[in-house]
Amino acid sequence: MDIKVKDFEGPLDLLLHLVSKYEVDVYQVPIVDVIEQYLAYIETLQAMRLELAGEYMLMASQLMLIKSRRLLPKLVDKEPDEEDLEQELLGKIEEYSRFKALSQELASQHDKRALLFSKPKQELIFEQAVLQKDKTVMDLFLAFSQLMAAKQEAFKYNHTVIERDDYRIEDMMELIEARLELEQELTLTDLLKHCDHLNEAITLFLASLELIKRQLVGIEQTSHFGQIVLRKEIQ
């Protein structure tokens, strides 16, 4: 089964998405937390063997430098370039935000004019579909990447050899549906809690995406950074 995850337009687009969740001025966000979320996203893409553009890795290396300097004990006065790196990054995110807002406004105006002359093109793209509570598949994917970052140590020390085909999406879909029959609702954290292997967690996640795609399961996240809740959809 081929499940695509909506690509961001670039690393700044991903960073803007993460920063916007805090709903504060870009210069007030907890930059280390944002960096950790970005790195967790990149690591999850790599673990899932999804294609990753080089610009994302370049940004990751720059973010790791900023994070390491932030976390190192301040034994000496802060070097000027340390502050410059962080401020330069935040400035780029702010500038990108302005350009993106402008491009969206221009696109909106273009669409309005197009309505005067022809019927708009109808598209239904699963990767960009809005789910319950205005959440998207990307919100689910970002939540998954955070959970995987938290479980990395457990996966690292589990040396049991698991064949690639030992976990099947179809089987995991049945497992999720069976649990929802019993429990009515299930958090993403609970769903992945007992996974001992990375492949198992990834297969469970892909199974949940397929159930959402088929509208058999809905998701809800009532607040930014809150728990992702899966519920059986009433047919």
Swiss-Prot record:
Keywords: Cell cycle, Cell division, Chromosome partition, Cytoplasm. It is found in: Cytoplasm. GO terms for biological process: cell division; chromosome segregation; DNA replication. GO terms for cellular component: cytoplasm. The keyword Nucleotide-binding does not apply. Pfam families: SMC_ScpA. It comes from the Bacteria. The keyword Cell division applies. InterPro entries: ScpA, ScpA-like_C. Participates in chromosomal partition during cell division. May act via the formation of a condensin-like complex containing Smc and ScpB that pull DNA away from mid-cell into both cell halves. Belongs to the ScpA family. Component of a cohesin-like complex composed of ScpA, ScpB and the Smc homodimer, in which ScpA and ScpB bind to the head domain of Smc. The presence of the three proteins is required for the association of the complex with DNA. PANTHER family: SEGREGATION AND CONDENSATION PROTEIN A (PTHR33969:SF2). This is Segregation and condensation protein A. It comes from Streptococcus equi subsp. zooepidemicus (strain MGCS10565).
